[in-house]
Amino acid sequence: MKYKDLRDFLALLEAKGELKRIHQTIDPFLEMTEISDRTLQAQGPALLFEKPKGHAMPVLCNLFGTTQRVAMGMGQKDISTLRELGQLLAFLKEPEPPKGFRDLLSKLPKFKQILNMPNKILTSAPCQEEIWKDNLDLGCLPAMHCWPGDVAPLITWGLTITRGPHKERQNLGIYRQQVLSKNKIIMRWLPHRGGALDYREWCKTNPGQPFPVAVALGADPATILGAVTPVPDTLSEYAFSGLLRGYRTEVVKCLSSDLQVPANAEIVLEGYIQPGETAEEGPYGDHTGYYNETEHFPVFTVSHITKRQDAIYHSTYTGRPPDEPSILGAALNEVFIPILQKQFPEIVDFYLPPEGCSYRLAVVTIKKQYAGHAKRVMMGVWSFLRQFMYTKFVIVCDDDINARNWNDVIWAITTRMDPARDTLLIENTPIDYLDFASPVAGLGSKMGLDATNKWSAETQRVWGRTIKMDKSVCDRIDAIWDELNIFNQQSVKKK
């Protein structure tokens, strides 16, 4: 099913028992985080806080708190079908012309989907039903203060829209935003992210000139999830959202700039970043489970707030996994696999364990074809997609290992690895500045673990053979297993 806006999606979730309305007065200061966290841990529903303390605007939390709801938001039945989206992205990243008539017929569905990529530009839109310009105050937003040590309320689910001076496509990214004053927030974007790259190019091309920015809150689920999906750099997240939705993304021009924002967003913040204006951001509790260091980031000055009537404020919290970002990571893991397999066909599975903060550790299983193959795959993971430049640990195993089963992975590490021979250490590589374990902010090391069976060129030892029972014996025991009644006998004895 496809959804025109966030409200369509919420109506479906409520009909399926996947949305809970909270009628009691709940404080955005800490209380919403605690309720959302307990609900997420229990794989509970999305939450709509109808009476946030001190505010009239309802707050939506835990929207993507299960992988099932992530799949639903992408218009899919369940998480298993997300690999089809990955196959589509792999095709868009490196499209291949049809090799013949049959191949053309097989590719027609992809070509038809591409027709949904261009934006549909509206002259008026629900997101501009109400306009605040004079004496605007960001305090009208029920922004959550998530953790006791946080310095200020935080806008967490804003889709930041930017455009570089030499680019036609607009970039959508999600960056946390500290509320600084009535009309200013801090834009915490890392140097490699699309918004930061657009801003850097703008400063070079238009020195001293304000950089237009817009932030959309409460867009439709396809647009929200399009902003966190690894789309090719040349493709706009709006275009990919159209593919997800099955029809073109509706946008409207900002009041203060030429940027286009989701027409059905609940709230839009318009404004600019004045080059050189920065402020100290943090500390905040983040997805690692720790409070991060403070650092200076650009300041976004808000000139307009536009919104729908009876707008809904979309929010979340981040903390030690599992949290909502880690659930998103687990779902998007399925999207990454076909993209990696197109470049490295030997990859069988790829897994980012949520407890590894969604991206800091990856387990890869491969069909090994030559000595040193595992190291090539490590290098490929670190370099092929920008999303993995901050992955600190890559474990490569053979395809007889289940990448998603720690018992299998640990067994492979402890039986197939020599620490000196099979550990690859690389120093002075890009690291998330939130990673306080690195010796220098933004720069640290990476480790690759080759837990594959070694070929003759890689060892002088006779390699071990895995133990496996004869099939005939297994068949014989299968035939008499129920007759043995072993477990029922044990339960009778325990009584």
UniProtKB/Swiss-Prot annotation:
It is a peripheral membrane protein. Homohexamer. Belongs to the UbiD family. One of its GO terms (molecular function) is 3-octaprenyl-4-hydroxybenzoate carboxy-lyase activity. This is 3-octaprenyl-4-hydroxybenzoate carboxy-lyase. The active site is at D286 (proton donor). HAMAP family: UbiD. It holds the Pfam family UbiD_C. InterPro entries: UbiD, UbiD-like_C, UbiD-like_N, UbiD_bacteria, UbiD_Rift_dom. Prenylated FMN binds at I174, Y175, R176, R188, W189, L190, R193, G194. The lineage of its organism: Bacteria, Pseudomonadati, Pseudomonadota, Gammaproteobacteria, Enterobacterales. Pathway: Cofactor biosynthesis; ubiquinone biosynthesis. Catalyzes the decarboxylation of 3-octaprenyl-4-hydroxy benzoate to 2-octaprenylphenol, an intermediate step in ubiquinone biosynthesis. Disulfide bonds: none annotated. Binds 1 prenylated FMN per subunit. It comes from Hamiltonella defensa subsp. Acyrthosiphon pisum (strain 5AT). Mn(2+) binds at N171, E237. Keywords: Cell membrane, Decarboxylase, Flavoprotein, FMN, Lyase, Manganese, Membrane, Metal-binding, Ubiquinone biosynthesis. It comes from the Bacteria.
